[in-house]
Amino acid sequence: SSCFAIDHKKVKWFGLDRCATDTEAPTGVYHDGAYCPVCHAPMEYEYVHYNHIGAYRCTSCGHARPDPDYAATELDLQNGKLILDGQFTVALAFRSIYNVYNILAAYAACRECGVEGAAIADTLSSYILKNGRMQTFTLGQHHGTLLTSKHENSIAYDTNLRYIASTNEDCTVLIIVDAVSRKYFTSETSWLWDIDFDQLNVPHVKRVILSGMYRNDLAERFRFTGVQNWEVIPGIPDAAAAIRDSGSEALYVVTCFSDRDKLLNLPDVKKEG
């Protein structure tokens, strides 16, 4: 997208300034932004928000991150606070880096349409997605959050795994791959190797359960991670029952739109909101 409308006069840019969760270099399994999309020379980064998103600059032609017209100037994910253009505060209902980009895009579009910044920030504060990408529920004594991640899209997975790793609360993680795509049938799962599952190798993730038709593909992928406390439970109902009957820690479910209702529609799962 950094190449869209290069040198066009009617372009407005939005972006996130440097924040506490940034890294000095990309940290994923692979690097999408290693080479310049203009001249194909190596790229360098001042900081990285996630994957290839951050302050980039080509070492050859100078293609670089534009100065944003609208910016998230301060971000505190731990306390759920976002400041836009240095003055408008948004309370984050969901404390994830990609949610910040969604908010920032909406803010920029509304400002271009003439809406006052304070009104936008007030409307966006504590906004909860209603499109099913995030669903809270209870299962037994567990409070659960389902994080929809597009299969065949490692960035979607990585950002959700990063969110789980950032919570610092004891939890179980259930990963379901039962259908690869809603649009077509395929059993191709090489995309699992592009996902940084090692993000779950943190002390507060007490248990990782792999379930669904492609649980063995997931298991093979996990054998090449540092995560030790994973197990396979083939059927989704059986996985849910095993979680229901044990413990009360937080529960995070990572799966796609095709598979989400296979869990949420189970009798023991009580959706919230």
Predicted regions and their residues:
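A short local loop/turn or secondary-structure capping micro-motif enriched for an aromatic residue
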Residues: T21, V100, N153-S154
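Extended acidic/charged loop-beta regions that coordinate divalent cations
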Residues: S2-A91
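Helix N-cap / loop-to-helix initiation motif
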Residues: N99, E116-G117
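ATP-dependent carboxylate-amine ligase
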Residues: Y30-G33, P37-M43, Y50-R65, A108-V115, ...
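A short, sequence-level motif marking secondary-structure junctions
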Residues: A91-Y98, T148-E152
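Short glycine/threonine-rich catalytic loop with a Thr-x-Gly-x-Asp
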Residues: G28-H31, F94-A105, N131-G132
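Glycine/charged-rich beta-loop-alpha catalytic/anionic-binding loops adjacent to active sites
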Residues: L84-L92, F137-G144
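Generic secretory/membrane-interface signal
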Residues: V11-F14, S96, T172
